[in-house]
Amino acid sequence: MSREYSENVLVQNSAGNLLQNVLGWEVVLAYNSEKLGPDGTLGRTSYGEVLLTRYFRQALLRLNPWLTPNQLDEVQKKFTAHVSTASLMQINEEKYFLLRDGIPVTVKRPDGRTEIRSAAVIDFKNPENNHFLAVKEMKIHSQLYRRRTDIVGFVNGIPLLFIELKKPTVDVQNAYIDNYRDYLDTIPQLFYYNAFLMLSNGLEAKVGTLGSKYEFFHEWKRLKESDAGSVELETMLRGICEKKTFLDLLENFILYDYSGGCTTKILARNHQYLGVNEAVSAYENRKLKDGRLGVFWHTQGSGKSYSMVFLAQKIRRKFVGSPTIVVLTDRDELNRQISDTFENCGLLGKTKASQFIASSGTDLVKKLRGNPSFVFTLIQKFNLPKEPPIYPDHDILILSDEAHRSQYGIFADNMMHLLPTASRIGFTGTPLLADDHITERTFGGYLSVYDFKRAVEDGATVPLYYENRADTVSYTHLRAH
């Protein structure tokens, strides 16, 4: 069968058409037609190059018009350099923070002194101010190997998206085993900058990150929470590759978790992304909600702790004044777990989580009267009902874990007395009871729901079955004893 009519190419063409005609990406077919050279198809001088420097340098000048030619070269050199002994994950992590936060460049001031400025690589505020390019059938060579990828997606010349496709009759896992793992070994430079890995046969699609085992790749089934859900590639492309969403995921929904003695790259799951953005929207409109932003009900095992981290990360990045975020639990073990998660995911900088944990009611008040980035506390430490209220000149956001527990009652009242201007979101893994007026009074109604039934359908958690069994005991045996 000719290439033009093979089933996997039909899947590839459908994906390319959607990216181009619906999502607004430029799409180029490089199969046997790419011309090398600065003025060639992609501006590459060799098949070993994965960073498209033509588009990269154009974007740098567009986003940073103050760059001189020498500074432009300096920025490119810093972005492409890496330690030869670094692992692929270490290189990927380093590149990620440069493309997210900007590349430091030395600038000479009029008085002759120098200062460090940050050169933006991507315009996260204005998606249309970036160049989105998808290249089909792109040749990539290393010293020993030659490969050709199905689709690679570039933003400003940076290869952020990898898509491996199979025909509909082939299991998606084959794309992981036969192709992706091979590319990791043979053309690792392709993944230095990668943010998203997609595997699909058209009818089913999975997305993951560098370093993930196949079982941790997940579906992207919905564009909004109310959708029934579809596992097809079209839904994933619409849900991830829409330009604004793509940049939102890139900037705010990727973590590097350092727990367990190794680095794990985390991408928000579909339900986390949708739920967290509902919470962000509620926070944006906090002045209209009298502090009660709502209850975030995502069933047990669906990644609630990471959702809290994603929410904190986005709010502190996107809102002027960066609020103090107070994380509440009701048990010491939970308090340590959630604070460790924030630390291991880098949200606390280089400061240990213990420095942000309130040791007593008095220490809690002392911390809150300052301007800390985070406070972790037990709800029981709101135990000073006569303490004067705090009216800070900055916002305070309270994230309460397992907000429905009954013992929150009196302490929740103390909390609202002490922090009358704070906004509050309650996180829970179980539905609220119909007569739970305390939680509603404290946090409001549901702002995001991801229940057990949907989580099981999505594979985000597993069902627990109870089987009522008893051993059979003979009556004769009982009489004998």
PLM region spans:
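Conserved nucleotide-binding/hydrolysis micro-motifs of P-loop NTPases
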Residues: 168-170, 203-206, 332-334, 381-383, ...
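Conserved coupling/interface region of RecA-like P-loop/ASCE motor cores
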Residues: 453-475
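Conserved RecA-like ASCE ATPase "motif II neighborhood" in helicase/translocase motors
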Residues: 374-399, 406-413
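Post-DEXD/H (motif II) to motif III coupling segment of the RecA-like Helicase ATP-binding lobe
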Residues: 409-461
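Conserved RecA-like helicase motor-core motifs
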Residues: 346-361
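Conserved small/polar residues in nucleotide/adenosyl-binding loops
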Residues: 476-481
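Conserved motor-coupling elements within RecA-like helicase/translocase cores
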Residues: 362-374
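ATP-dependent helicase/translocase motor core
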Residues: 2-324, 333-348, 371-374, 380, ...
